[in-house]
Amino acid sequence: MAAQPLESPVRRTGGTEVRLREPVPEDGPALWRIARDSRALDVNSPYSYALWCRDFAATSVVAEDDDGPCGFVTGYVRPDAPGTFFVWQVAVDHAHRGRGLARLMLDRLGARLGGRGHRFLEATVTPGNTASTAMFTSFARDHGCKLSRTPLFGVEHLPEDHEPEVLFRIGPLPVPRRASR
């Protein structure tokens, strides 16, 4: 399965060229490693990352440099709300952090899915995750969208040491403009 490049895929981050593309199953081990090494995400099984790259490639994005994947955003379209896509995980390898790569991936994914008619983005964020809070807040602001925050899963829904999950709902996303002829 060939990886599908995304529009304007090249960006330099700290002197390193980074390309954005849809994931392929072979990316699974690298995504699992990036998630594990983040020390912030709930790490899923290695199998689930390979499966995600196969089944949800159209709603996910991978950043890669010459050494391979260095970041990712995984997501899916909500089955009971087809106009909404849910961002499952966002992670960037330590060597590429602090350069806006997570936000770049989110912007590209938002544009791609907005172009397919998805008007809302959702994600859950724990209260202690200030980086994700800042990223989703700036995404909403920069795209002229409303951002609502509501409790989704409290401590009664999660294992003992897990913080509650707050639902961030962003939208409606702007309809991408088509190039003039």
Task: List the predicted regions and their residue ranges.
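Acetyl-CoA-dependent GNAT
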Residues: P25-E26, R33-W88, D93, L173
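Conserved active-site alpha-helix within GNAT-family acetyltransferase domains
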Residues: R103, P127-R149
